[in-house]
């Protein structure tokens, strides 16, 4: 019996030397797990839930490491969180969070800006433990990621038109209008929600702001639905040109005509 035990221990130690694994099959320092995109399989490694904080503008996301090693996880934009209160709004994240590092058993909480998905429902309260829909790949996610990809150019136009858009909160509010348009929100419904959440129940101010941005929001919403990059470029050119003073606009058009003429001459030579 003693001889048998010694042989077993010797075999186990030999396996550890050859493979780097202890007898129980677990490494002392498991490799870092990097999660670039969230799938159903990710649930075996990290737990992702959210807590409402009384607004549709942001949510607290709780990320917990349930694996045996260290995890690095990226949270993409467009994560869809389901409100446990069916009478209140679900939320979808407006921004991604890069590289959250978690040791075994560690949990981190990050506040993430969000968009509301249903203008007709109540504003979220403070209910905890919202589930994340890992499989959501709908039009809102695609719209957010298209905007994110071309955010620099779109923001440049918005800020040029109105310096108030230098504020990220103002830009998020503008794109929230686009999200509501994608979900068939009506003008009066949107104005009522803006008045309650953003303008201290002042419907007159909410209405004034809404009508100052709605034309651009409708046009941009149509482009985002089609994901047409060329249409976006043309729209931005037209919008930026319209912001130029009249005399500069004429000069710009003349310069463009001259460039086109010179290009034609070069081709004919």
Features from the language model and the residues they span:
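Bacterial N-terminal signal peptides that target proteins for export
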Residues: 1-9
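C-terminal motif of bacterial Sec signal peptides marking the signal peptidase cleavage site
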Residues: 18-20
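Bacterial signal peptide processing site
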Residues: 22-24
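Short, solvent-exposed loop/turn segments enriched in Ser/Thr/Gly
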Residues: 54-61
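Asparagine-centered strand-capping/turn motif at beta-strand->loop junctions
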Residues: 61-75
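Intrinsically disordered, low-complexity Pro/Gly/Ser/Thr-rich segments with frequent PxxP/GP/PP motifs
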Residues: 82-135
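Metal- or metallocofactor-binding catalytic centers and their adjacent structured scaffolds
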Residues: 132-170, 203-204
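Activation targets extended, charge/polar-rich intrinsically disordered C-terminal tails
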Residues: 157-269
């Amino acid at each position: 019996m003693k001889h048998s035990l010694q042989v077993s221990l010797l075999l186990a130690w030999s396996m550890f030397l050859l493979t780097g694994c202890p007898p129980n099959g677990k490494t002392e320092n498991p490799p870092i797990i990097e999660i670039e995109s969230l799938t159903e399989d990710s649930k075996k490694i990290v737990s992702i839930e959210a807590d409402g904080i009384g607004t549709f503008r942001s949510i607290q996301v709780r990320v917990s490491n349930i694996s045996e090693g260290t995890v690095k996880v990226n949270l993409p934009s467009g994560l869809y969180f389901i409100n446990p209160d069916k009478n209140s709004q679900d939320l979808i994240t407006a921004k991604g969070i890069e590289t959250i590092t978690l040791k075994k058993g560690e949990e981190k909480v990050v506040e993430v800006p969000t968009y509301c998905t249903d203008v007709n429902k109540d504003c979220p309260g403070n209910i905890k433990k919202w589930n994340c829909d890992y499989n959501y790949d709908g039009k809102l996610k695609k719209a957010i990621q298209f905007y994110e990809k071309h955010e620099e150019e779109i923001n440049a136009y918005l800020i040029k038109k109105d310096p108030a858009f230098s504020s990220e909160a103002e830009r998020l509010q503008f794109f929230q209008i686009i999200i509501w348009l994608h979900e068939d929100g009506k003008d009066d419904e949107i104005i009522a929600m803006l008045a309650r959440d953003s303008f201290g129940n002042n419907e007159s101010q909410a209405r004034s702001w809404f009508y100052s941005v709605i034309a651009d929001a409708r046009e941009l919403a149509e482009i985002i639905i089609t994901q047409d990059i060329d249409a976006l470029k043309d729209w931005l050119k037209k919008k930026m040109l319209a912001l130029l003073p009249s005399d500069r606009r004429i000069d710009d058009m003349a310069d463009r005509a001259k460039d086109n003429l010179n290009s034609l001459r070069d081709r004919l030579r």
